[in-house]
Amino acid sequence: MRANVLKRKLTLRIKRKKRIRAKISGCENFPRISVFKSNRTLYIQAIDDVKAVTLAAVDGRKLGVKANKEGAKKIAAEFAKTLKAKKIEQAVFDRNGYVYHGVIAALAESLRENGIRL
């Protein structure tokens, strides 16, 4: 029973992800900021969909932070520094099918506080 519930939740997240990706894309000036959330950590990257390259990425494991709101704020601050070093100040936020609440919302708000326009 539990396996079916988990499978259904994953299926619904992937469906949301596909709907979102059909509507947004990033370019060199306005990259798509994609977030992946695991049980232990967060991963965030800026993607140029036109050239299909990753412009910048931050891994929560390397920073030693957990997948909670405080960790999301630290990762976002580090990611904002990386983007500013590459002269990127505006981007499109891709929540990757996750609900815009909790950790994902804290990450986006912290990016905005650090000067990245989403």
Swiss-Prot record:
CDD domains xref list: Ribosomal_L18_L5e
GO CC annotation terms, alphabetical: cytosolic large ribosomal subunit
Gene Ontology biological process terms in this record: translation
Top-rank taxon: Bacteria
Coiled-coil intervals, chain numbering: none
Protein keywords: Ribonucleoprotein, Ribosomal protein, RNA-binding, rRNA-binding
Molecular function in Gene Ontology: 5S rRNA binding; structural constituent of ribosome
Similarity-based family: Belongs to the universal ribosomal protein uL18 family.
Function noted in UniProt: This is one of the proteins that bind and probably mediate the attachment of the 5S RNA into the large ribosomal subunit, where it forms part of the central protuberance.
HAMAP family xrefs: Ribosomal_uL18_B
Subunit structure: Part of the 50S ribosomal subunit; part of the 5S rRNA/L5/L18/L25 subcomplex. Contacts the 5S and 23S rRNAs.
Protein name stated in the entry: Large ribosomal subunit protein uL18
Organism: Campylobacter jejuni subsp. jejuni serotype O:23/36 (strain 81-176)
Highest classification ranks of the organism: Bacteria, Pseudomonadati, Campylobacterota, Epsilonproteobacteria, Campylobacterales
